[in-house]
């Protein structure tokens, strides 16, 4: 990639229909794990106007009121009025869960290459990434895109901007100079709102636009990056119909929002609703943990990790490190350090990151990475000193 360029990432709010589905799936996972952390869960959710469908595979000894969990999640998000297209009190909730296939379970319970270990729940490839663009070691465009929609929800819920409704999207286009963030070229923020905020179908009131820029955008973005920045606020105009009424929502359809905003490749597997024997989730968390510790150790300015697994096999097929020329030692040496310092077998990941806990609903909106939440063990940098010492730095 050239040293001077524009790069864009987007995020969506907790009220976006796909994120409603993700949060319901992870709320159900948490409710199950609170009773039986050894459960196998693959909880999928569909949301539409006045309707929630829960489907997937669950094997558990827990007794969970799935319908109530779905309603409670919708209420927390803010869909509490029939005018919004879905209302937690009156929406229909259909439940269609089955048990995990015995054919899958036998390979997960006992790995073919290590009978004392857990096999991967499926084949696949996962990526982790970290860079020094923000203190959280995340790419700046996705980090700030998340913070914009997070603030939209905050001001909606605390009543400071009472005309806001739950659905919203953000997009940040960053200008890079010499490969580093220099300024923000464009900010797009589209938010659902009450009907009185538009002058016409295609034009918002000036007071609405001003409130979004002054109360949501400017308090979040670094002032020094706002140099001739363009602001596009509800650029299509009126946005009253939104959420599951505006679009059908599905679990696992915002995988780039969930990760790095396109700054690195994605293996294709979604996270929400999956217990950590599913390496789509747990190995992606572990790869972030590895990459973040390498950057925190000062061994690279940016670091991409790829791991891959075969179903029923514990050990990863590969551990590949790519630092795009920013590493202080060769990438193959970093890969050997990773293999020495991190147990990337599924059971090792679960133990290393303490993943058999009801911690997942919080991950399902505003990004799984780059948030200093106490439950997010994959954001720790506790291996940085050991990696630095092992690298002789």
Swiss-Prot record:
Q: How does it assemble?
A: Homotetramer; dimer of dimers.
For this chain's record, the cofactor binding note is: Binds 2 divalent ions per subunit.
Required co-factors: Mg(2+); K(+)
Q: Which GO terms describe its biological process?
A: one-carbon metabolic process; S-adenosylmethionine biosynthetic process
Please give the name of this protein. S-adenosylmethionine synthase
Which pathway does this chain act in?
Amino-acid biosynthesis; S-adenosyl-L-methionine biosynthesis; S-adenosyl-L-methionine from L-methionine: step 1/1
Cite the binding residues for ATP: 16, 167-169, 238-239, 247, 253-254, 270, 274
In Pfam terms, one family for this protein is: S-AdoMet_synt_M
Annotated Mg(2+) binding lies at 18
Matches recorded under CDD domains: S-AdoMet_synt
What protein family does this chain belong to? Belongs to the AdoMet synthase family.
């Amino acid at each position: 990639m050239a040293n001077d360029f524009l790069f864009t990432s987007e995020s969506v709010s907790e009220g976006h229909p796909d994120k409603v589905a993700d949060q319901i799936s992870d709320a159900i996972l948490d409710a199950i794990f609170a009773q039986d952390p050894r459960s196998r869960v693959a909880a999928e959710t569909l949301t539409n106007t006045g309707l929630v469908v829960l489907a997937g595979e669950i094997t558990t000894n827990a007794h969970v009121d799935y319908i109530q969990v779905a309603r409670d999640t919708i209420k927390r998000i803010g869909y509490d009025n029939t005018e919004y297209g879905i209302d937690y009190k009156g929406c229909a909730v259909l439940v269609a869960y089955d048990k995990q296939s015995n054919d899958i379970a036998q390979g997960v319970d006992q790995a073919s290459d290590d009978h004392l270990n857990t096999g991967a729940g499926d084949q696949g490839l996962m990526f982790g990434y970290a860079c020094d663009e923000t203190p959280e070691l995340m790419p700046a465009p996705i980090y700030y895109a998340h913070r914009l929609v997070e603030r939209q929800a905050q001001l909606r819920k605390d009543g400071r901007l009472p005309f806001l409704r739950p659905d919203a999207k953000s997009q940040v286009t960053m200008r890079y100079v010499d490969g580093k963030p220099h300024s923000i070229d464009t900010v797009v923020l589209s938010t659902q709102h009450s009907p009185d905020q538009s002058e016409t179908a295609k034009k918002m009131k000036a007071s609405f636009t001003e409130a979004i820029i002054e109360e949501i955008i400017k308090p979040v973005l670094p002032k020094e990056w706002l140099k001739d920045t363009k602001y596009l606020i509800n650029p299509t105009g009126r946005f009253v119909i939104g959420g599951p009424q505006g679009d059908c929502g599905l679990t696992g359809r915002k995988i780039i929002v969930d990760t790095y905003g396109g700054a690195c490749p994605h293996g294709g597997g979604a996270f929400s609703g999956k217990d950590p024997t599913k390496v789509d989730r747990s190995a992606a968390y572990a790869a972030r943990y590895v990459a973040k510790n390498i950057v925190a150790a000062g061994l690279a300015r940016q670091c991409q990790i790829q791991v891959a697994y075969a179903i029923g096999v514990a050990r990863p097929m590969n551990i590949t490190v790519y630092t795009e020329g920013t590493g202080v030692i060769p990438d193959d040496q970093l890969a050997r350090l990773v293999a020495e310092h991190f147990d990337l077998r599924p059971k090792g990941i679960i133990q290393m990151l303490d993943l058999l806990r009801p911690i997942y609903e919080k991950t399902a909106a505003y990004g799984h990475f780059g948030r200093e939440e106490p439950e997010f063990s994959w954001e720790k940098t506790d291996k940085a000193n050991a990696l630095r010492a092992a690298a002789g730095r």
